[in-house]
């Protein structure tokens, strides 16, 4: 039986803005960092493909590394060479109002000798902003991913025959309302981890 852990957080944040006015066509540095349309993405900033009201940012990479202790053990260390194949895509809107961004990625880890350690991780997500008025915005994001715990992780059983697989569902939502130099924000977040059962090196199910 898999193990599921959920967490929900709700917070209210009130921020006093500095002196000075901001015109309708200007955004402060803080506003730009918070606004999903202005978030910097160094990995994707180099090339973009325009597609109507969206820009598509594809990414592909190949990496390799040598690990002299792939099981992160204190004795009987095992070495191997690992190849990582990754591909990802991000689609961002170019609208003057509102925003919608989508992303997805896949990473394949291939071990030269210890193929039981091979794993496939992937993720998908969407985030956006609804500009209700000049001073009011809704923001939200939802993400889902399948991943594996690293060997040596404190929560990962050392006797597992394969890396522990888990899925993660996340969601966030917030509402901002500006009152002259005062901004009130209400935000909440949710996360749910689902750890899959594993089998030990002697065939015992690890729950």
Map each language-model feature to its residues.
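Cleavable N-terminal export/targeting peptides
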Residues: 1-35
């Amino acid at each position: 039986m898999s193990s599921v852990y959920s967490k929900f957080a709700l917070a209210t944040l009130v921020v006093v803005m500095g002196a000075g006015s901001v015109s309708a066509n200007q955004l402060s540095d803080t506003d730009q960092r918070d606004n999903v349309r202005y978030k910097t993405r160094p990995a994707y900033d180099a090339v973009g493909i325009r597609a109507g009201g969206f820009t598509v940012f594809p990414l592909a990479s190949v990496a390799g590394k040598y690990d002299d202790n792939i099981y992160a053990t204190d004795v009987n260390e095992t070495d191997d060479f690992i190849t990582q194949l990754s591909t990802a895509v991000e689609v961002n809107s170019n609208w003057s109002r509102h925003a919608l961004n989508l992303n997805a990625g896949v990473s394949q880890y291939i071990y030269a000798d210890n193929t039981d350690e091979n794993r496939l991780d992937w993720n998908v997500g969407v985030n956006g902003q609804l500009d209700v008025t000049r001073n009011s915005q809704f923001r939200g994001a939802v993400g889902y991913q399948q991943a594996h715990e690293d060997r040596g992780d404190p929560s990962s059983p050392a006797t597992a025959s394969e890396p522990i697989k888990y899925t993660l569902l996340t969601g966030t939502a917030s509402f901002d309302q500006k009152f002259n130099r005062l901004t009130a924000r209400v935000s909440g977040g949710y996360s749910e981890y689902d750890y899959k059962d594993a089998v030990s090196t002697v065939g015992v199910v690890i729950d």
